[in-house]
Amino acid sequence: MAEERDAEGTEALIAELHKKIKDAFEVFDHESNNTVDVREIGTIIRSLGCCPTEGELHDFIAEIEEEEPTGYIRFEKFIPVMTRALVERRYRPAAEDILLRAFEVLDPAKRGFLTKDELVKYMTEEGEPFSQEEMEEMLSAAIDPESNTINYRDYITMMVVDEN
């Protein structure tokens, strides 16, 4: 009896995930032919609350991209892989305390902020570098226009995804 209830709950969860995935995919299916441009996949995945690295995104796309013609992703290939990623809670965003520690490493003087120039340097020259577009998007959300700095505690609070 309890097993039946669990199975029904799982089926309901999967159905709900499929609807969310379909809704997100359809936003980018401009031809209404169940395909999207491969360049939109990262946006779709992130709109579903996932935060893959560029490497993880590349692997995800390699698993589902059409062989001929390349550059497109079919919904039928996308939905099982995306469903599995959501069920397994892959590509979770970093926790607030981890983000704070990362910013504190970049701020050895413990000022509580980084200048715009410091932020741009770190985000475009270190680790997995941001693209120009990603950097502009981050700056528009993060930088205080009056001081030209980012108060990283405020920024982290604003950016952290609520898991509930």
UniProtKB/Swiss-Prot annotation:
Residues 16-51, 94-129 form the EF-hand domain. Component of the nexin-dynein regulatory complex (N-DRC), a key regulator of ciliary/flagellar motility which maintains the alignment and integrity of the distal axoneme and regulates microtubule sliding in motile axonemes. InterPro entries: EF-hand-dom_pair, EF_hand_dom. The keyword Cytoplasm applies. This is Dynein regulatory complex protein 8. Its main location: cytoplasm. It holds the Pfam family EF-hand_7. One of its GO terms (molecular function) is calcium ion binding. It is found in: Cytoplasm, Cytoskeleton, Flagellum axoneme. It comes from Mus musculus (Mouse). GO terms for cellular component: cytoplasm; cytoskeleton; sperm principal piece. Keywords: Cell projection, Cilium, Cytoplasm, Cytoskeleton, Flagellum, Repeat. Belongs to the DRC8 family. Component of the nexin-dynein regulatory complex (N-DRC).
